[in-house]
């Protein structure tokens, strides 16, 4: 099977670089939210301690998701199950965020960028990884 990967080695490397760079988004946002609280995402002074605690917890999850994506990078072609699960988690969060758009209106541009990452970019990376898996290994 290693011989089959050779024609796609460059494309695998490009995917690895893309995932490594794009995983900086949840890692950075998660770290900022955990350290500085939800105020880092906008005015939050009147939200109270419970909202801050929830925001820090969710930021920790976001940070961990980014680290988990990083863990797929070295052998991304063999990380199908993990990559699909992480994509499902991110996409589900995006659906929840999109629900908020319909219920309370558009969020800030930063949050809309997050929405694009969750509903478009991350699934595209997953489909790309699956395509490479099929091409390299003939399996899903």
PLM regions with names:
Residues 8, 67-81:
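Juxtamembrane helix-break-helix junctions at the cytosolic face
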Residues 11-52:
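Membrane-helix boundary elements
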Residues 24, 28-32, 51-73, 88-92:
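Core segments of alpha-helical transmembrane spans in multipass integral membrane proteins
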Residues 45-52, 106-117:
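Non-cytosolic membrane-interface motifs at loop->transmembrane helix junctions
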Residues 83-97:
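Hydrophobic alpha-helical membrane segments
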Residues 95-112, 130:
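Membrane-helix boundary connector in multi-pass membrane proteins
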Residues 119-140:
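Membrane-water interface at the C-terminal end of transmembrane alpha helices
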